Amino acid sequence: MSLTIIERRNTKKELAANFNLAGVTLEQAAQDLATMPEHVEAVLQLQVDQIEEPWILRNYLNKQLAAQGKTPLPYSRLQGDPAVHWFLNTDLIAKGRLN
């Protein structure tokens, strides 16, 4: 699945908004996701090697927000269960790691 320029812009804004709402640092997210802070920042900017990475970050942020009793801000493209998208590796997403 490829995103249009507008969809990419919106998705980056949505990830950033939920990242800020979760109140985590790049360092904390990187540690939790078994990667480096620079990699988390790259995923926030949709500069990814694997198309599953934004889904992994989305799931992580949603869990962080749920643990705080907060509701994630809506996503326009990263919606629902990634398993419905045949092109995504759901096993990779389920691992919850960005390494």
Model regions: which residues?
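Helix-turn-helix/homeodomain-like alpha-helical modules used for DNA recognition
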Residues: 70, 74-99
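Residues in the recognition helix of alpha-helical DNA-binding motifs
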Residues: 18, 32, 43
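Recognition helix of helix-turn-helix/homeodomain-like DNA-binding domains
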Residues: 35-50
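A short, Lys/Arg-rich alpha-helix, primarily the initiator
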Residues: 1-21, 59, 63-71
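Residues within the helices of the helix-turn-helix
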Residues: 27, 38, 59
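Short, basic-rich loop-to-helix N-cap that marks the start of a DNA-contacting helix
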Residues: 47-59
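Short alpha-helical "recognition helix" segments of helix-turn-helix
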Residues: 25-31
